[in-house]
């Protein structure tokens, strides 16, 4: 009992410090702003022909993106998806042969960096990747093919406020991890397995709105503090902060219906990386990751993660990439990280052109928008764009596509996926008024509840639908048990990554 009381005291104290983060951020930001002009490691010369291997603060990042946009107007577009707590833009740069206009039949992917402000390697790698793509478009056949057939959206910093108070050389700890209100943005999304009561934060809300507007097919979130590619689910039906502590040495996987695809995507990144596939263990308390990949919940479960949200609510396959054992390594090590990750990033992005893609049209050849689709026996769905387009990453094999839309007869189509290129599949739906007409077949699949494109996993379906039925806003965290829970979550995050 004495040990338990001591542990609770430590956790409550830790949570008090966490809740005070916003005040420390404000003071730190003023100090850093005063020193930034004299800081040699935060430098960007917009007249330079290439990006230096240094860390770039918000102002320098903004200048860099604007400069690249002006230099390469035919390959880049710059937009903001919203603002941080302290008013910084969440900049996104599109790199594509068609940066301003949608390319019919061409998929959108996104790469997000710096969701934790003190995990900074990914932020800088994305700036270098932007430069690499635009500078090699004319000379590199692979790069040209990728940009001609894909629209790539880069969000270098999802947590610019947190970055401004982080310190170079701090390999562990939480300073700068959270946003300016002291919230972990990777715990701030809707969760499939558990009601998430965290107060909504503007950075996470901006990403949710972004995902709702663009049908992303593939995504990665870049982190630091470990060296591993992690894939959904991040949470489990029985997840708890206590379980996270005890499962960190090798917990129970929480697998998606697309587990084969997620493992493939993760291993594609790992095997093309300089070191990741060796299963490097960064800290004494962390696992050895076989082949450099792990199921998120098997590592440690968390509630409100971004990759699970993308998969369940966005129909987008996202993995989490932990790129460095040190969260904020010295800038002198950035060239090494770039060499280790460049090919992995390129290979990963090209995986969007695997599986099946096509159009859903009606009998008059008009696109069917927001038709709900799923691969039979894989009960997490996706939907068509306003142009009737769809994409799904799949490994070679034979599959059946189930298609549903309001006012149309449901349809089931069998197809085959091969290794070399995506399968092109066009589906025609017939109006339900033609039911019973000769030559128009029906399937036994019926839409039941208006959310048929949502996932249905037997082990968690009841709890999920209970969550969906709630109509009242989620209350903010409060009370001693919430404090204990938050304390455990933050303790686990800072220890394990």
Language model segments and positions:
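Active-site/substrate-binding loop(s) of hydrolase catalytic cores
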Residues: 98-267, 271-283, 287, 291-293, ...
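Beta-strand-rich domain onsets/edges
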Residues: 245, 329, 334-355, 426-429, ...
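Short, acidic Ser/Thr/Gly-rich low-complexity loop/linker segments typical of extracellular
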Residues: 375-396, 415
């Amino acid at each position: 009992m004495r040990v338990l009381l001591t542990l609770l005291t430590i956790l409550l104290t830790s949570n008090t410090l966490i809740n005070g983060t916003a005040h420390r951020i404000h003071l730190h930001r003023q100090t850093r702003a005063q020193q930034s002009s004299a800081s040699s490691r935060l430098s960007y010369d917009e007249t330079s022909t290439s990006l230096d291997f240094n860390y770039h603060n918000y102002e320098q990042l903004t200048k860099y993106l604007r400069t690249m946009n002006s230099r390469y107007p035919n390959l880049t577009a710059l937009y903001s998806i919203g603002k941080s707590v302290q008013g910084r833009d969440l900049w996104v740069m599109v790199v594509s042969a068609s940066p301003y206009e949608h390319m019919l039949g061409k998929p959108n992917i996104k790469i997000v960096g710096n969701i934790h402000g003190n995990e900074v390697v990914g932020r800088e790698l994305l700036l270098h990747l932007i430069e690499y793509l635009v500078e090699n478009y004319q000379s590199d056949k692979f790069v040209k093919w990728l940009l001609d057939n894909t629209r790539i959206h880069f969000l270098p910093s999802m947590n610019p406020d947190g970055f401004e108070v982080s310190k170079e050389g701090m390999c562990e700890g939480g300073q700068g991890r959270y946003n300016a209100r002291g919230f972990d943005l990777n715990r701030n999304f809707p969760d499939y397995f558990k009601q998430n009561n965290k107060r909504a934060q503007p950075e996470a809300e901006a990403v949710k709105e972004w995902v709702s507007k663009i049908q992303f097919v593939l995504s990665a979130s870049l982190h630091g503090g470990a060296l591993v590619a992690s894939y959904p689910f991040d949470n489990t039906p029985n997840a708890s902060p206590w379980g996270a502590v005890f499962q960190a040495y090798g917990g129970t996987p929480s697998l998606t219906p697309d587990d084969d695809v997620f493992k493939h995507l993760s291993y594609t990144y790992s095997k093309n990386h300089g070191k990741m596939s060796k299963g490097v263990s960064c800290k004494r308390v962390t696992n050895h990751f076989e082949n450099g990949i792990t199921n998120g919940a098997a590592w440690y479960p968390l509630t409100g993660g971004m990759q699970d949200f993308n998969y369940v609510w966005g129909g987008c396959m996202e993995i989490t990439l932990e790129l460095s054992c040190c969260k904020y390594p010295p800038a002198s090590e950035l060239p090494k990280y770039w060499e280790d990750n460049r090919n992995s990033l390129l290979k990963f992005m090209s995986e969007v052109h695997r599986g099946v893609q096509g159009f859903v049209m009606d009998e008059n050849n008009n696109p069917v928008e927001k038709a709900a689709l799923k691969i039979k026996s894989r009960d997490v769905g996706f939907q068509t764009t306003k142009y009737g387009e769809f994409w799904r990453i799949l490994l070679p094999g034979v599959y059946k596509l189930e298609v549903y839309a309001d006012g149309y007869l449901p349809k089931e189509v069998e197809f085959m996926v091969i290794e070399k290129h995506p399968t092109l599949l066009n589906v025609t739906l017939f109006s339900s008024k033609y039911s019973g007409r000769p030559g128009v077949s029906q399937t036994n699949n019926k839409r039941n509840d208006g959310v048929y494109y949502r996932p249905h996993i037997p082990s968690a379906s009841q709890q999920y639908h209970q969550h969906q039925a709630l109509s009242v806003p989620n209350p903010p965290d409060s009370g001693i048990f919430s404090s204990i829970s938050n304390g455990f979550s933050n303790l686990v995050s800072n220890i394990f990554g």
